[in-house]
């Protein structure tokens, strides 16, 4: 695709917000759905959440990340939900999801308040984007896996995140 953004240079640090470690209690956060309506993380309290975090649907690695998690979502139990979060406007997210047939994950925007990004330490302050990573939160609200991808051009470790979910059984 020719409309993709290149974020590979320079490196941007994840400078804003607290970073989590496995075993921490997950914070409640609020993001926006495709109709600009707020969605609270507590809506998924009885499910295991895989939170896929990425800068923008208009980058090639982010597209790959969403496509991969969409494919994986179809193979997971019904008590697992994948949330895909960026600061893209919901309209751009809808366009991307339609074009790439993303229909097994729930794509939400953190653009308004950076609520998730600030609470989980994923904000790239200089760009007002989210960094790349994955968070797994169990049904009890405990972070069971977290990855902050240090090189934004790299994909997250999908296998490690999915293994963490399987081990919750």
Please report, for each region that a protein language model flagged, where it lies by residue.
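Chalcogenol-based redox active-site neighborhoods
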Residues: 1-169
């Amino acid at each position: 695709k020719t409309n993709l953004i290149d974020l590979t240079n320079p490196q941007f640090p994840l400078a804003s917000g607290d970073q989590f470690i496995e075993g921490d209690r997950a914070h409640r956060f609020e993001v926006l759905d495709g109709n600009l309506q707020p969605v609270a993380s507590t809506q998924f309290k009885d499910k295991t959440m895989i939170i896929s975090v990425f800068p923008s649907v208009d980058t090639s690695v982010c597209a790959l990340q969403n496509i991969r998690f969409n494919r994986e979502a179809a193979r997971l139990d019904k008590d697992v939900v994948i949330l895909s979060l960026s600061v893209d406007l919901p309209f751009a997210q809808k366009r991307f999801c339609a074009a790439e047939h993303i229909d097994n994950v729930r794509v939400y925007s953190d653009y308004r308040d950076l609520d998730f990004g600030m609470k989980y330490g994923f904000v790239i302050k200089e760009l007002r984007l989210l960094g790349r990573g994955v968070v797994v939160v169990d049904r009890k609200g405990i972070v069971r896996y977290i990855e902050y991808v240090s090189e934004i051009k790299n994909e997250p470790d999908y296998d490690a995140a999915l293994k963490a979910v399987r081990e919750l059984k």
